[in-house]
Amino acid sequence: MRIGIPRERLTNETRVAATPKTVEQLLKLGFTVAVESGAGQLASFDDKAFVQAGAEIVEGNSVWQSEIILKVNAPLDDEIALLNPGTTLVSFIWPAQNPELMQKLAERNVTVMAMDSVPRISRAQSLDALSSMANIAGYRAIVEAAHEFGRFFTGQITAAGKVPPAKVMVIGAGVAGLAAIGAANSLGAIVRAFDTRPEVKEQVQSMGAEFLELDFKEEAGSGDGYAKVMSDAFIKAEMELFAAQAKEVDIIVTTALIPGKPAPKLITREMVDSMKAGSVIVDLAAQNGGNCEYTVPGEIFTTENGVKVIGYTDLPGRLPTQSSQLYGTNLVNLLKLLCKEKDGNITVDFDDVVIRGVTVIRAGEITWPAPPIQVSAQPQAAQKAAPEVKTEEKCTCSPWRKYALMALAIILFGWMASVAPKEFLGHFTVFALACVVGYYVVWNVSHALHTPLMSVTNAISGIIVVGALLQIGQGGWVSFLSFIAVLIASINIFGGFTVTQRMLKMFRKN
């Protein structure tokens, strides 16, 4: 089957549904790829790069003659007319907000897969395009805030005086929120974050931010991986928290969204008016109405007291190269599910919950919404039950047996000491102490330090190898035992270096 990559015609859209790297992966699945001329120009991918990757460059509407169409945005009306019956379209669709679009696509007797309808389950993470774009949006939000903010993010002490660090508050600790937290923290800002879901507290703290909590308990999970609408009492408590924080922080990033509903208003005009002059608010929910009452979608609005409210709706498109690569990879992972035989043909299997969730129209029949998939939150740690007190069974062994074994061991040691060389007692004492000390040292080391501990064992094994090599030329059993010692110690050395090398690779960026 042929995959077509048309040029995105939506105003200000810079992304493309495939990159040269993803084209190579599509070819390995058995597909042929046709790219409309100039489709990747705004994302820094020219036609030559696509040709080198193995794609065919086509002109005009011929790309729409492909059996599979990969796009970023939903097709326009004139593009829908170019879809042939039986074609499979994959793009962002937003079926809840676009019922007329769904009807028009169904009338063309096509199959439509919406990348915004990927189920929030672990198995579908590799094709979760919303998370990919949210990650970029959160990062870019901090970049835009830093551009508009008039000071450093990090604190400094210079000859000209002390520069205080910027204070950043992130509302919503989803993918976008965590990306914003990481970017702001890496720039040296003091970061604090709030989320209605208490289970994300550890994630926020692991990113180096302070987690803001309310003295209010309420279940925030909705069962589908998203937050739900909270009670009036909870909203009142969080609004009081935001009002207090607005007077302290310099930058606010809001990411709160509820699927299928307008974005909740979390930052009121009074809160913005109480902020310091030069402060910045980045509203990632601007496209759905915004979390701030001052937000103007697609623009920067400056209030009378000098607070800038950024309402850009194209933050992922402001990093087009990265966005296209991540989105293209999400599409490749979806096609891997559809084409398990790698023969260039796809199978829409509704027994697969991921494919069922993504497919909103199947052969002209609207199949959205898919049956809900319940997603369980991370379970709370259960309180440990008091250990049961068990009465120890009395040993039926006779006490003389233990004393007899101890006496036998003493007699055996005395006999060996009488017939062995004088140096034996010294060597045996050192050996016994080494066994005791080594046992307690190794078993009291934390599991996280076992890999670094291998460097010490490598040194000890090296000493064993040296000692064995000095004895290996004596012949007889001595040579045989020396060879065994060299073999076992060498295995420990090479294995230790291999594991240590793997550990060190985990700390490298490349």
Swiss-Prot record:
The transhydrogenation between NADH and NADP is coupled to respiration and ATP hydrolysis and functions as a proton pump across the membrane. Belongs to the AlaDH/PNT family. Its EC number is 7.1.1.1. One of its GO terms (molecular function) is NADP binding. It is a multi-pass membrane protein. The chain crosses the membrane at residues 402-422, 423-443, 453-473, 477-497. NCBIfam families: pntA, PRK09424.1. NAD(+) binds at residues 120-122, 175, 195-197, 238, 257. Gene3D superfamilies: NAD(P)-binding Rossmann-like Domain (3.40.50.720). One of its GO terms (biological process) is NADPH regeneration. One of its GO terms (cellular component) is plasma membrane. This is NAD(P) transhydrogenase subunit alpha. The keyword Ligase does not apply. It is found in: Cell inner membrane. Residues 1-401, 444-452, 498-510 are cytoplasmic.
